[in-house]
Amino acid sequence: MDGMSKELRRFNYLMGEIDAAYHEAALNLGLSDSAMRILYVLCGCGSFRCSLRKVCLCSGLSKQTVNSALRKLEGEGLAFLEPIGTKGKDVCLTDAGQALAEGTVARLIAVEDAILGSWPAEDVEKYLSLAEQYLTAFREKAKHLGNR
C-alpha cells in the first residue's frame, strides 16, 4: 500500500477539525452532540416534527444512538414520539423542546447561514458540488470494500 497522500491527510485533518468545531459548539450550547444533531434535523423540518427514520438518516447517527438520545430528551420533557400508521413514528418537540431548539440550534444554523452567505455564490455552489461528488464516489467505492 502506498502512503496516504498529502491531500488526503489535509482532507482528513479538516474533517476532524470540523467535527471538533461542531462538538465545541454543542458544548457551548449545553447540548450533547447527539441531542444537537437531533434538534438540528427537527429545526430543518420546519415544524419541529419529523419521522424517526428521517431523523436517523439526516443526523448521521445510528438508530440506537438516536433512540438513546430521544429517551433522554423525552425524560427532560423536550420531545416525544408519536405513532404514525402501523409502523412509523414521528419525533416531535414539546413547547419546551421548541424553545430549546430556537435558543440553541437555530442560533447555530444562523451562524452557518452567515458563513455561507459571506461567500460568493459560485464558491458556495462549487463547495457543495464537490462535496456531493465526493459523497457519491465514496458511497459507490465503499460498497466494494468487502469484496477483494
Predicted regions: what is each one?
Residues 1, 122-148:
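C-terminal regulatory/oligomerization modules of transcriptional regulators
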Residues 71-128:
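Charged, amphipathic alpha-helical coiled-coil/dimerization segments
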Residues 1-29, 76:
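N-terminal leader segment of winged-helix/HTH proteins
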Residues 20-65:
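N-terminal helix-turn-helix DNA-binding core of bacterial DNA-binding proteins
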Residues 10, 22, 51, 111-112:
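Hydrophobic alpha-helical segments typical of transmembrane helices
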